[in-house]
A protein has these predicted regions:
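Catalytic histidine-centered segment of alpha/beta-hydrolase-like enzymes
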Residues: 256-266
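Short beta-strand/loop motif that positions the catalytic acidic residue
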Residues: 213, 219-221
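Short, surface-exposed "cap/lid" segments of acyl-processing enzymes
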Residues: 26-60
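N-terminal cap/lid segment of alpha/beta-hydrolase-fold proteins
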Residues: 1-25
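Conserved alpha/beta-hydrolase
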Residues: 51-77
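Glycine-rich "HGGG/HGxG" loop immediately N-terminal to the catalytic nucleophile
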Residues: 42, 69-84, 258-259
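Conserved acidic catalytic loop of the alpha/beta-hydrolase fold
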Residues: 90-108
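Conserved loop-alpha-helix segment in the C-terminal half of the alpha/beta-hydrolase fold
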Residues: 223-256
Length: 294
């Protein structure tokens, strides 16, 4: 089976859900990757740069990997009116994964990885979607408070208007990325519900959902993070929210900017994430042995 990702569209009721998929025989687990705002599943298979692809790296380690177009993106972009409730978005995403990689063929389970605005959906999937099948969660490009420059830019955002200076903010510093990406090579129209989810994320939804996560969590922070506060104190505050998680790791990624999975340091970042997945697999096996021995 080819390790090159291929597009998939599956129907969840009357709503088409799309994404990029790479499948391996007898997968050790399934990695589900959730992109951030204003992009698509292609974020995890960097166009023209296969070495930077999370999906290809995952397959080389024995994992099936699914990069979903979040509800409101890709094939579901025409169904915005159905997507305002977070419960509906979780239902669509989980059912899409079930169609692509049915339960019983996922190896040890599902590992969820998300970037930026995708963290809301991934964490909701972890606590309300897959139940006990979740091995762990990787979050990147998120936090609890905006940096001053980001606050100034994002304060201009409305439901109908992309704020001036947003691209420069998200892709700073530009020398850390392939040049074609900085000029919009991965851009996609934003989902209509994102203004609300972004507004409520740091103060309400992130802390509330984090407290319900019961699996290991890694939060990756770019050395040159340009959106969220990433001081040691800020990172510790994020980690402290995961009160029910057995393990929380803060991973500082050298030579990287906000868009970790498409920067020139993406391969190193992905290899680290895959090591964390390995640790989650070991922890899961340890729990199985303990249950069998008790």
């Amino acid at each position: 089976m080819s390790s090159a990702p291929h597009p998939r569209v599956v129907m969840v009721g009357a709503v088409p859900m799309s994404g990029l998929v790479v499948e391996v025989p007898d997968p050790r687990a399934v990695i589900v990757a959730i992109h951030g705002g204003g992009t698509s599943a292609a974020y995890f298979d960097c166009p023209g740069h296969p070495r930077l692809s999370l999906l290809r790296s995952a397959a080389s380690h024995g994992f099936t990997a699914i990069a979903l177009d979040r509800p409101g993106y890709g094939a579901s972009a025409l169904y915005q009116d159905e997507l305002m409730a977070p419960e509906r978005r979780v239902e669509l995403a989980v059912c899409a994964v079930d169609e692509i990689a049915p339960p019983g063929g996922r190896g040890a389970g599902v590992f969820l990885l998300a970037h930026s605005a995708g963290c809301d959906l991934a964490m909701r999937m972890a606590v309300d979607g897959f139940d006990t099948e979740v091995l762990g969660v990787e979050l990147a490009g998120t936090g609890l408070s905006f940096q001053s420059r980001a606050k100034a830019v994002l304060s201009q955002a409305t439901t109908a208007r992309r704020p001036e200076g947003l691209r420069g903010l998200l892709w700073h510093p530009i020398n850390l990325y392939p040049p074609e990406l900085v000029t919009g090579g991965l851009s996609a129209p934003r989902a209509e519900y994102e203004f609300e989810t972004t507004s409520n994320w740091a103060q309400r939804d992130f802390p509330a959902i984090a407290a319900r996560v019961r699996v290991p969590v890694e939060v990756s922070v770019a050395e040159y993070e340009s959106v969220w506060e990433a001081t040691p104190t800020a990172n510790a505050e994020v980690a402290e929210m995961f009160t029910a998680s057995p393990r929380v790791v803060i991973n500082e990624v050298a030579g990287a900017g906000h868009n970790l999975s498409v920067g020139l340091a993406a391969d190193a970042y992905h290899q680290h994430v895959l090591s964390f997945v390995e640790e989650c697999l070991i922890a899961c096996k340890g729990m199985d042995v303990e249950v069998e021995a008790s």
